[in-house]
């Protein structure tokens, strides 16, 4: 099996070295053909990363990052692996992850999505579901289990087919990955959860009301609803007759995240005084696509 890894470099050199070491250890431990696509913001040379990876007989290529979301469409044209995944500089996996993904993807060959247990820098999983039975491998059916899963690319492995054939809409800014993965899951309905393999993200994700960078951005409170959630939910209702329940749960989680991020007086929010009502009205417009039983039940 071949694996393609999309690696977006960090501005912090030490973070990149953490990920480089992780990749070297993973690749040495697994008998795999690996392709690494390296993306960077600045036009400086990172030949050290390429040369070190190539000593392991890995195909590594470096590309300039035009904007945060342009790499997805570019990578879709250049990946060669059977399985595709993504890393930010500073991210790392549990030892043996690539070998485990190889084995599981071959065993569950009809599935296209494989997700690791994702944790943030403090070791917590945020609001996202964990398997209470502590099974190593769980087949998750999102039509039956309405949890709020961490639908972002880091820590997720996709088959080449679903990665290449589905569109990343980079005009959605910070919601680009969410749009891609929620639409994909609405079609696929099932994914494989590798509960024993951990992906540690260097970036804090939505749900953390102190360190998630979105709480300081106006677009998280405005464009997120006007440009993404409202038209997204409307489109799903027209397509499926109702918005899939797992997506409704995810929407409720995002609303709660914004409210919880603005319950204090530390002036970290970006909603101007007097604009709170307008922000709530935008959220309210999206609720026309949410089942009332979902937000009135305990």
Positions of PLM-derived features:
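Conserved donor NDP-sugar-binding/catalytic core segment of glycosyltransferases
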Residues: 96-128
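A recurrent flexible, glycine/aromatic-enriched loop bordering the glycosyltransferase active site
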Residues: 137-158, 216
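Acidic donor-binding segment of Leloir-type glycosyltransferases
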Residues: 24-65
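Acidic donor-binding loop at a coil-to-helix junction in glycosyltransferase catalytic cores
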Residues: 173-180
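Catalytic beta-strand/loop signature of glycosyltransferases that borders the donor
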Residues: 117, 191-205
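Conserved small/polar residues in nucleotide/adenosyl-binding loops
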Residues: 295-298
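Short aromatic/hydrophobic "clamp" motif used to bind/position activated sugar donors
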Residues: 84
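Short, well-formed alpha-helical segments that are part of the catalytic scaffolds
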Residues: 12-27
């Amino acid at each position: 099996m071949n694996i393609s890894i999309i690696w977006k470099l960090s501005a912090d050199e030490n973070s990149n070295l953490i990920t480089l070491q992780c990749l070297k250890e993973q690749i040495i431990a697994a008998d795999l053909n690996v392709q690494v696509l390296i993306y960077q913001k600045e036009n400086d040379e990172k030949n050290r990363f390429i040369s070190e990876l190539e000593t392991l007989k890995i195909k590594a290529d470096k590309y300039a990052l035009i904007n945060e979301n342009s790499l997805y469409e570019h990578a879709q044209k250049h990946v060669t692996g059977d399985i595709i995944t993504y890393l930010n500089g500073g991210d790392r996996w549990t030892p043996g992850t690539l070998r485990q993904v190889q084995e599981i993807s071959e065993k569950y060959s009809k599935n296209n999505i494989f997700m690791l247990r994702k944790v943030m820098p403090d070791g917590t999983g945020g609001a996202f579901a964990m398997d209470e039975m502590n099974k190593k491998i769980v087949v998750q059916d999102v039509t039956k289990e309405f949890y709020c899963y961490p639908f972002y690319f880091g820590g997720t492995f996709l088959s080449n087919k679903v990665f290449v054939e589905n569109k990343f809409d980079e005009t959605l800014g910070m919601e680009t990955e969410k749009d891609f993965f929620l639409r994909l899951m609405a079609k696929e309905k099932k994914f494989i959860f590798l509960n024993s393999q951990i992906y540690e993200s260097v970036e804090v994700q939505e749900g953390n009301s102190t360190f998630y960078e979105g709480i300081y951005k106006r677009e998280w409170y405005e464009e997120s609803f006007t440009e993404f959630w409202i038209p997204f939910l409307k489109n799903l209702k027209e397509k499926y007759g109702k918005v899939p329940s797992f997506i409704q749960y995810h929407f409720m989680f995002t609303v709660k995240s914004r409210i919880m991020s603005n319950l204090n007086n530390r002036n970290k929010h970006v909603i101007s005084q007097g604009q709170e009502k307008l922000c709530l009205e935008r959220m309210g417009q999206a609720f026309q696509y949410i089942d009332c039983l979902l937000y009135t039940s305990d």
